[in-house]
Amino acid sequence: KKELVVGTNPSFAPFEFTDKKDGKVMGFDIDLINALAKKAGYEKVTIKSIAFDGLIPSLESGNIDVSITGMSITDARKQKVNFTDPYYESGLMAVVKKDNEAIKGLDDLKGKTIAVQLGTTGAKYAETIEGAKVKTFDSSDLACLELKNGGADAVISDLPVLQYFLKQGGSQYAKSVGTPKKGDFYGIATAKKNKDLCDKLNKALAELKKDGEYQKIYDKWFKAE
C-alpha cells in the first residue's frame, strides 16, 4: 500500500486547523495534499499534528514524508529541506483594534507591542522592528486573543490567515492596516534525500492547476462570501 505521511501544525486557519466538532484536521493545505497524493498514486494519506518547529526535524528523521503547513519558502529552510514549486502566494499583514487610529501600517509599529505566532515569517519580521516588544504564541488565534484582551497593539501574521480571522468574526473588534507585504510563497517540504517525492508532487501540482482542481479547492477556502 502506498501511504503518504504528512506533518502539519494545525493552528493556521484556513490552511490547517482542528475542526471544533470532531477534532479532525482540515483546511486548504489538507484538501490540497489529499488531491496531490491521489494524483501521485498514493492510496492513503495520514495526517500527523506536529509543533511548527518540530516539522523540519521530523522530515529529516523520516517520521513524516512531507510537511504542508503554510510554510514560507526561505533560503534558511532550503538548506535543510527540498521545497516543491510554490502552491500559494502569501504576504504579511498587521491587524489592530478597530478604534486604533495611530497605527496605519507596518511602518507605524516601532516601539509597539506585537503579538505573533512562534516560528512564522511574521515573528521574524516583528523581531526587525525597532524598539518593538514581541510576544510569541503557539497559534495565530492566541496572538489575536492577546490583541482582543488589550495585551498587544498589533498582530503580524500571514495575509490569508488574518483575512480569514477577520471574516470569521475578528472584524467585530479588529481591522487590517496598511498594504500587505507581498512576495512570500508557500511550498510543500520534503526531506533533502527524497528528491523523487518532490518531483512527483510538482508534477501532480502542475496537473491540478491545469485541470481546474486546484482552483476548486482554492475557491472553497478563499472565495469571499
Segment roles from a protein language model:
Residues 46-108, 174, 178-180:
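Acidic, polar ligand-binding/catalytic clefts
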